[in-house]
Amino acid sequence: MRKWIQLALLVLCFFCLSGAALAASAVTPDGYFNGIRLAGKVRVVDSFPDIRVQVVSAFPDLRVQTVDYFPDDIGQWQFVDYGEDFTVQFVNSFPDIRIQFVNSFPGVP
């Protein structure tokens, strides 16, 4: 009887942890992070960013395509020196979101 209880608790913990991992994405399905639409003109800063970003090669929260003009779709970013929609800081640890640079099909995976 005791083994059944331990097994049931183990299965319950597994489902709780896997559900928390699925809900861990900081980017909403429509491409927003804390009310910031993740498209448009972006300025890279060294301190006090709107979003801290880590570049990864797998399992991103957002796929980003850099463009020169008209960054209208979610995941299309135009890097600028002024007139930005939001600011980012590239970090190696403790990011707000994880991004992957792509050449096509930007957006939320």
Give residue spans per PLM region.
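Bacterial N-terminal signal peptides that target proteins for export
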Residues: M1-A8
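Repetitive, compositionally biased segments used for assembly/scaffolding
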Residues: A24-P109
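Bacterial N-terminal signal peptides
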Residues: A8-G19
